[in-house]
Amino acid sequence: MADSGPAGGAALAAPAPGPGSGSTGPRVYFQSPPGAAGEGPGGADDDGPVRRQGKVTVKYDRKELRKRLNLEEWILEQLTRLYDCQEEEIPELEIDVDELLDMESDDTRAARVKELLVDCYKPTEAFISGLLDKIRGMQKLSTPQKK
């Protein structure tokens, strides 16, 4: 992996580049401390701080991400069956897995999902039971796991 910046340098965030620039997200620049070696061409004679482009990423457990993706695909498949329609026609509802994982018990999770599916005319018990089985043991994705 490439060097992400000099030790002790400050990270500066810049807004996302304009359309047509080929880049999609915000850029992060690392500023070298004054007098640091490798200040780039021109050395200390440059007018502004030397900026070096780097990437910042948040690491999530790939296995957990794969489980979450599979779960979301399963949920979509089940909802199309429950509502007897195409994915685009499913009523506006959001089953927040992280919210369910925060709840104390399966009973409260089941009650929450039942609230969300109140407009569904087909029986939802099998879906709710399957969903609770699938999320058991999963981890929240809102904060990365430290290794």
Curated annotation (Swiss-Prot):
The modification N-acetylalanine is found at A2. Residues 61-103 form a coiled coil. The keyword DNA repair does not apply. InterPro entries: CPI-17 (IPR008025), CPI-17_sf (IPR036658). One of its GO terms (biological process) is innate immune response. It holds the Pfam family PP1_inhibitor. Residues 1-15 have a biased composition (Low complexity). The modification Phosphotyrosine is found at Y29. Disulfide bonds: none annotated. Phosphorylated primarily on Thr-57 by PKC (in vitro). An unknown Ser is also phosphorylated by PKC (in vitro). The keyword Membrane does not apply. The modification Phosphoserine is found at S21, S32. The modification Phosphothreonine is found at T57. It comes from the Eukaryota. GO terms for molecular function: phosphatase inhibitor activity; protein phosphatase regulator activity; protein serine/threonine phosphatase inhibitor activity. GO terms for cellular component: cytoplasm. Keywords: Acetylation, Coiled coil, Cytoplasm, Phosphoprotein, Protein phosphatase inhibitor. Residues 1-55 are annotated as: Disordered. It is found in: Cytoplasm. Inhibitor of PPP1CA. Has over 50-fold higher inhibitory activity when phosphorylated. Belongs to the PP1 inhibitor family. This is Protein phosphatase 1 regulatory subunit 14B. It comes from Rattus norvegicus.
